[in-house]
UniProtKB/Swiss-Prot annotation:
InterPro entries: Glyco_hydro_22, Glyco_hydro_22_CS, Lactalbumin, Lysozyme-like_dom_sf. The gene is Lalba. This is Alpha-lactalbumin. Disulfide bonds join C25-C139, C47-C130, C80-C96, C92-C110. GO terms for biological process: defense response to Gram-negative bacterium; defense response to Gram-positive bacterium; lactose biosynthetic process. Residues 20-142 form the C-type lysozyme domain.
Amino acid sequence: MMRFVPLFLACISLPAFQATEFTKCEVSHAIEDMDGYQGISLLEWTCVLFHTSGYDSQAIVKNNGSTEYGLFQISNRNWCKSSEFPESENICDISCDKFLDDELADDIVCAKKIVAIKGIDYWKAHKPMCSEKLEQWRCEKPGAPALVVPALNSETPVP
């Protein structure tokens, strides 16, 4: 019995699970500093992320020979590095696996690069689903719990 005590203590000290699917309000709060970046509203971003990943930070989608990762569905063809697509341009200079956690700061930095280079229509859901009638994407819960995002704002330079 005594040899199981350390294992038991280790298990209860770890979180039971890591959340990967978030609510509209959690995502909206976590990315609120993106509001207005390159003229894109928070409501547009909230809508795009719903239609892109379903607010799932661990979403992985195979698409035309490449793979898209995380909440923003960032492609390994151009933006991040993965072993399955070694010829990637890796414009964001990051491993694609970094987009599969709940730490969104690196996802946001890369998303800002994508928007600066390609525009919001890089995310195919934007034009048909997120360019008008956006009130449904408003979050009415003040103080919704934030995902792990260090202080960023729309003025944060994109490296």
